[in-house]
Amino acid sequence: VNKKSSNQKKELIEFYRGMLLIRRFEEKAGQLYGMGLIGGFCHLYIGQEAVVVGLEAAAKEGDKRITSYRDHGHMLACGMDPNGVMAELTGRSGGYSKGKGGSMHMFSKEKNFYGGHGIVGAQVPLGAGLAFADKYRENNCVTFTYFGDGAANQGQVYETFNMAALWLSLIHISEPTRPGI
């Protein structure tokens, strides 16, 4: 077996493990939500695991991420501890937002994860702000801004597209939200 083929196989197995972690985590979160152990809303990322795992494979250290309220899978894909994510979902102080953010408002500056946001499309211009900060700092980082297809009709989304096309290192990812509903 040549080394390149062996490394590729290992990489594919890691992708699969990442997707499986997200799927199993979300299934458990859905179960806990149904039992009333997760307060508020709980928007699952089931059916979209490959999107974030693939993009995280292309991310480099220092790159930033921002997403909507369907954020658990993103946190897991960027290497955050599943126990910390679950603690946040269940309102415990060991969560990434000290149990105050719940399902939709998690955050970790250490992992360059700038949150899930509850307002449809609001994260898109916020992602542009993160990208502008990187441009001013001249640090060659990229911001990954995820949004659901429901945000695609929001004015600020298209305004941000125009800004990004002209000036920013910003990748917009439109995810179909139907699989998670």
Regions found by a protein language model. Give the residues of each.
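Cofactor-/ligand-binding subdomain signature composed of acidic, glycine-rich
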Residues: 1-39, 61
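A generic structural signal for nonpolar/aromatic side chains embedded in well-ordered alpha-helices
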Residues: 19, 86-89, 173
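Short, cationic motifs built from Arg/Lys/His that form the positively charged side of catalytic pockets
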Residues: 23, 70, 175-177
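Cofactor-binding active-site loop characterized by glycine-rich and histidine/acidic residues
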Residues: 27-30, 35-167
